[in-house]
Amino acid sequence: MDKFRVYGQSRLSGSVNISGAKNAALPILFAAILATEPVKLTNVPELKDIETTLNILRQLGVIANRDETGAVLLDASNINHFTAPYELVKTMRASIWALAPLVARFHQGQVSLPGGCSIGARPVDLHISGLEKLGADIVLEEGYVKAQVSDRLVGTRIVIEKVSVGATLSIMMAATLAKGTTVIENAAREPEIVDTADFLNKMGAKITGAGSDHITIEGVERLTGCEHSVVPDRIETGTFLIAAAISGGRVVCQNTKADTLDAVIDKLREAGAQVDVTENSITLDMLGNRPKAVNIRTAPHPGFPTDMQAQFTLLNMVAEGTSIITETIFENRFMHIPELIRMGGKAEIEGNTAVCHGVEQLSGTEVIATDLRASISLVLAGCIATGETIVDRIYHIDRGYEHIEDKLRGLGAKIERFSGSDEA
């Protein structure tokens, strides 16, 4: 199992190119199941979760390849299997997104109950109830969610019980080929939903309101091919901005969009960072200063993103002052805090709230990554700590950060990947 060895006390500065958003690329890849013609996708990151998704699509009969430019070419015209099997699905919760397009286009589909990050309850109930309201018959048997419908799904008004990015995407995908009009109320508003809707509309869907809490989909009989470029990854962008903020550095994030990161940029400025934005870049300069502690409360978009909570927890661990972090989206998402405490951080956890007391310096040690965003916060902590830090279970990072050690080295980090068996 691979690990990272990180040598600390680096000031992280330089320029970094931001990859395409994993959280947009995944639903878009599954949405390609709906198309009767080939699709070309650019700016798709090279990640473990992306490769798993391509393998699931291939299992269904989709022709899925990358060309010499890195573009992903998909042809779902000859799908002949309708099951996403456990051996592929077990590592990734996003695989539930295969179900909606299969049922919408082929009137049947089954997906193994998925796996993924271990950060609390992320039930698929909202996906299932949404599809049922569109007319699908769904049963859970032998670890599989099995769905079928005798004819086309039928549009209706759906109020999502709790704001859910995943369920919003499932319902939106399914409704594109339903009879009549579907209205989604209490829809999630994330930029990745907007990007998926843009992709579906390029294929001939009729979706309006994406990015608001009220999405309308007029069903069409078929979707055709198109070309689409995946939006930049706002969470990767925020992560590299944090890298500069915690180390007193200056980082320029290229090929990204500031308008998807308002809540994060506001908090970075509150922490004392100088942040400048252009149409396609964001520059953060700490001018060599230590950050100030900032209170964080996660919320659905356009609120503060839960996927940036771990990175800001690290910032608060080394900031001047005391801060309160409240996690409202996922339970059990403070697993990075005990590891940061092992590095000399000071914090107390009570329920969904953490109180961080900033310290001047962290110390390198061995830590264990528990999920995608927690793991990157530990790597960044190693970059600024004294001595050497070993980060174990970095397969979590490979699920969501493209070429992470190369990008960090480009900013001056001293980091190397090694196999656990090579440690001696």
Swiss-Prot record:
One Pfam family hit: EPSP_synthase
Pathway the protein acts in: Cell wall biogenesis; peptidoglycan biosynthesis
Keyword Cell cycle among UniProt keywords: yes
Enzyme class: transferase
Location(s) in or outside the cell: Cytoplasm
The enzyme's E.C. designation: 2.5.1.7
Swiss-Prot/TrEMBL keywords: Cell cycle, Cell division, Cell shape, Cell wall biogenesis/degradation, Cytoplasm, Peptidoglycan synthesis, Pyruvate, Transferase
Active site residues of this protein: C117
InterPro entries in the cross-refs: Enolpyruvate_Tfrase_dom, Enolpyruvate_Tfrase_sf, MurA_subfamily, RNA3'P_cycl/enolpyr_Trfase_a/b, UDP_GlcNAc_COvinyl_MurA
Protein known as: UDP-N-acetylglucosamine 1-carboxyvinyltransferase
Organism: Haemophilus influenzae (strain PittEE)
Source species taxonomy: Bacteria, Pseudomonadati, Pseudomonadota, Gammaproteobacteria, Pasteurellales
Encoding gene (name): murA
